[in-house]
Swiss-Prot record:
Gene Ontology molecular function terms on file: ATP binding; UDP-N-acetylmuramate-L-alanine ligase activity
Alphabetically ordered keywords of this record: ATP-binding, Cell cycle, Cell division, Cell shape, Cell wall biogenesis/degradation, Cytoplasm, Ligase, Nucleotide-binding, Peptidoglycan synthesis
Cellular localisation: Cytoplasm
Catalytic activity: UDP-N-acetyl-alpha-D-muramate + L-alanine + ATP = UDP-N-acetyl-alpha-D-muramoyl-L-alanine + ADP + phosphate + H(+)
EC nos: 6.3.2.8
HAMAP family linked to this entry: MurC
Role noted for this protein: Cell wall formation.
Pathway the protein takes part in: Cell wall biogenesis; peptidoglycan biosynthesis
Gene Ontology CC: cytoplasm
Pfam families: Mur_ligase, Mur_ligase_C, Mur_ligase_M
Taxonomy, superkingdom: Bacteria
Record GO biological process: cell division; cell wall organization; peptidoglycan biosynthetic process; regulation of cell shape
Gene that this sequence comes from: murC
Protein name from the UniProt record: UDP-N-acetylmuramate--L-alanine ligase
Length: 486
């Protein structure tokens, strides 16, 4: 450990006390974005970090390079020296490491509980909502970094400008994505909370009851202190409905006329969105946002609302918006490729809910009006496909060419009629487009080779392993030479 790092740790310890009697922290499922981010922050705070996952990936390799120990596979001996065990929601209670920790009476906490501990002595800014959390978290982080405030951040995806999804900063500010999928965001006690939107998702957590989901968001906002701030998107009808029930200071944002932070005159020019932000009692801001789509203008205005309330300079806000590189797998422009039939543009996107897919399609249509849109879509979870089946069909039939993969299960058991083949048949039966169903993802490159044309915008879409299609394109030699990004 360098002298500089020792001095930095001493400065951090003056703000954030050590967790007593905790030396070694073990993460089960350390390769996930949320888990790895917390692990990296704690590693940089001086804790010994170990973890396990079913395979190594770039995230775990990064942690190992920084001094963590990562085991491939789960076994009881991995937790033998752990002071505390952190588990992700994807881990089954019968996991041998959980059983061993329980037998040893080692504390077992969920990811959000450990995030709450990181936030406890800091000025926390939490970003919640069904869609847009990761990008909004990155944009808030970018503004605060541009202002020289050096925040700690923990995001659910790669902050491309930082080259990581988490970083330990030297200030008291912690910016974090808040996960509602298992209601664990109720552990967090931030000073500022953003709610981007609320839709029916992860409904198994909420007993299939949308009213329970809405009440959970209200409870989350009431974790704010009486002097805290709730930043809420007034364009979203469910969020608008909840505002009168929130007994904290509320700042609204959106395109709506009654928004406190209002977006006007939005236009998209290729990869960039340009618009004006109108703020009561403050100068208007003419924003150039280096990521496309009206949905990202909303994400940006949420970040601007928080920064404005914190008296961050307009110069820092404008520079952060123009300079943002976005987040990994969120309309991620991977380049242009020679197909043998002309040049095609490749974009990768993580969106896996119908609303997310829809706004991605609209961004592609708005920015590249002359291109044929070829979507490769991989449904994520059988339960989501079942619950939102008609919504998926309505959204997916908007593209010009649709290649459908089977469902990425994420550990779920198959549900009859909620699979890729069934969805393909339903869309075909509507008569608008004729989907191509590919049962084996390894057969995808050859299926794409049969339909791709010069001038296409090829969009790989979904939260599963569809993102590795770009690598397969190279192996198929659809792109012999990757061209310079446009």
């Amino acid at each position: 450990m360098t002298i500089e790092h020792t001095q930095d740790l001493a400065q951090i310890r003056a703000m954030v006390p050590e967790m007593r009697r905790v030396k070694s922290i073990h993460f089960i499922g350390i390769g996930g974005a949320g888990m790895s981010g917390i692990a990296e922050v704690l590693l940089n705070e001086g804790y010994q970090i170990t973890g396990s996952d079913i395979a190594q990936n770039p995230v775990t390799e990064r942690l190992v390079s920084k001094g963590a120990t990562v085991y491939v596979g789960h076994q009881a001996s991995n937790v033998a020296d752990a002071s505390v065990v952190v588990v992700s929601t994807a881990i089954n209670e019968e996991n041998p490491e959980i059983i061993a920790a329980r037998e040893a009476r080692t504390p077992i906490v969920r990811r959000a509980e450990m995030l709450a501990e990181l936030m406890r002595f800091r000025h926390g800014i939490a970003v919640a909502g069904t869609h847009g959390k990761t990008t909004t978290t990155a944009l808030v982080t970018q503004i605060y970094s541009e202002a020289g405030l050096d925040p700690t951040f923990v995001n659910g995806g790669l902050v491309k400008s930082a080259g990581t999804n988490a970083r330990l900063g030297s200030s008291r500010i912690l910016i974090a994505e808040a996960d509602e999928s298992d209601a664990s965001f109720l552990h967090l006690q931030p000073m500022v909370s953003i709610v981007t939107n609320i839709e029916a998702d992860h409904m198994d957590t909420y007993g299939g009851d949308f009213e329970t989901l809405k009440q959970t968001f209200i409870d989350f906002l009431h974790n704010l202190p009486f002097y805290g701030q709730a930043v809420m998107c007034v364009d979203d009808p469910v969020v608008r409905e909840l505002i009168p029930q929130v007994s904290r200071q509320v700042i609204t944002y959106g395109f709506s006329e009654d928004a406190d932070i209002r977006i006007e005159n939005y236009v998209q020019e290729g990869q960039q969105g340009k618009f004006t932000v109108v703020r009561e009692g403050k100068a208007n801001l003419d924003i150039t946002l280096n990521i496309p789509g009206r949905h990202n203008a909303l994400n940006a205005s949420a970040a601007i609302a928080v920064a404005t309330e914190d008296d961050i300079s307009d110069e820092a806000i404008l520079k952060a918006m123009a300079g943002t590189e976005g987040t990994g797998r969120r309309f991620d422009h991977l380049g242009e490729y020679e197909t043998g039939k002309g040049v095609a543009m490749l974009v990768d996107d993580y969106g896996h809910h119908p609303t997310e897919v829809d706004v991605t399609i609209q961004a592609a249509r708005s920015g590249w009006t002359d291109k044929r849109l070829v979507m490769i879509f991989q449904p994520h979870r059988y339960s989501r496909t079942r619950d939102l089946y008609d919504d998926f069909a309505n959204v997916l039939e908007q593209v010009d060419v649709l290649i459908l993969l089977d469902v990425y299960s994420a550990g779920e058991k198959p549900i009859a009629g909620a699979d890729g083949r069934s969805l393909s048949r339903t869309i075909r039966g509507r008569g608008k487009i004729d989907p191509i169903f590919v049962a084996d993802i390894n057969a995808l490159p050859s299926a794409l080779a049969n339909v791709i044309q010069g001038g296409d915008l090829v969009l790989t879409q979904g939260a599963g392993d569809v993102g590795r299609v770009a690598k397969q394109l190279e192996s198929l030699q659809l792109d012999i030479n990757k061209m310079q990004n446009a």
